[in-house]
Amino acid sequence: MQSNKVHMGHTARKRFGQNFLHDRYVIDQIVAAINPQPGQNLVEIGPGLAALTEPVASQMDKMTVVELDRDLAARLREHPTLKEKLTVIEADAMRFDFGTLMGEGKGPLRIFGNLPYNISTPLIFHLCEFADRVEDMHFMLQKEVVLRLAAGPGSKAYGRLSVMTQYYCQVVPVLEVGPGAFKPAPKVDSAVVRLIPHKNPTIVAKDIRCLNRVCTEGFGQRRKTIRNSFSNFITDAQLTELGIDGNLRPENLSLEQFVMIANWLADQQQA
């Protein structure tokens, strides 16, 4: 009897967080959401056994895939219907410079993939660094992560991931997916999300490192009031000057308020 970790002759590798999508209905729904068009600059992260690659590539002349697993990268290079269309980059997406895919005459990046759940959060942070060169991103993620991405102030799911992602992108949940759509089946529900980078952001952080610090320090102690969690860099009186109540908890602050505090901090560091 074949192991449930084996799909199309490939054994899923736990260290790569591999769960292969095989449900045709779900695949069709994702491809429809991506809506690939000839001439666009499409990039897939972790194509695996090409469940999404094949239907997307059928509508494209060329596309790029970034695959860490050398066995899967080799399969893609020899794939009978894909090898002429694909540029296969054997690399770790967490360290890859996606800006190198913006060659002469190429449009903004459209990135998609069934992301390994064990690296999805840091990978999204990495991809946000390229937001000014990205048209949109479509990812299959753990449902809980999609809820965190889309969460607003006042909810338990709202945190650093929500604020930092929403600073760069509009977050649009697209589709919920059960474990049975994958082989091997994960122990959690999944969901597809669309991330659309803001073209003309109305909220601008002077130093993104300051915004990251404010989010990290705030949500690292989310039961504390911001008067206490931010006490090592801003006083209660200074928060009041910004029009922010020091009795609030971090989860009650809006994106605009986080950026306001971060910009105040950036100004202090420049002074």
UniProtKB/Swiss-Prot annotation:
Transmembrane segments: none annotated. PROSITE patterns: RRNA_A_DIMETH (PS01131), SAM_RNA_A_N6_MT (PS51689). GO terms for molecular function: 16S rRNA (adenine(1518)-N(6)/adenine(1519)-N(6))-dimethyltransferase activity; RNA binding. Its EC number is 2.1.1.182. It is found in: Cytoplasm. This is Ribosomal RNA small subunit methyltransferase A. Disulfide bonds: none annotated. It comes from Aeromonas hydrophila subsp. hydrophila (strain ATCC 7966 / DSM 30187 / BCRC 13018 / CCUG 14551 / JCM 1027 / KCTC 2358 / NCIMB 9240 / NCTC 8049). Specifically dimethylates two adjacent adenosines (A1518 and A1519) in the loop of a conserved hairpin near the 3'-end of 16S rRNA in the 30S particle. May play a critical role in biogenesis of 30S subunits. Pfam families: RrnaAD. Keywords: Cytoplasm, Methyltransferase, RNA-binding, rRNA processing, S-adenosyl-L-methionine, Transferase. It catalyses: adenosine(1518)/adenosine(1519) in 16S rRNA + 4 S-adenosyl-L-methionine = N(6)-dimethyladenosine(1518)/N(6)-dimethyladenosine(1519) in 16S rRNA + 4 S-adenosyl-L-homocysteine + 4 H(+). The keyword Methyltransferase applies. Belongs to the class I-like SAM-binding methyltransferase superfamily. rRNA adenine N(6)-methyltransferase family. RsmA subfamily. GO terms for cellular component: cytosol. It comes from the Bacteria. S-adenosyl-L-methionine binds at N19, L21, G46, E67, D92, N114.
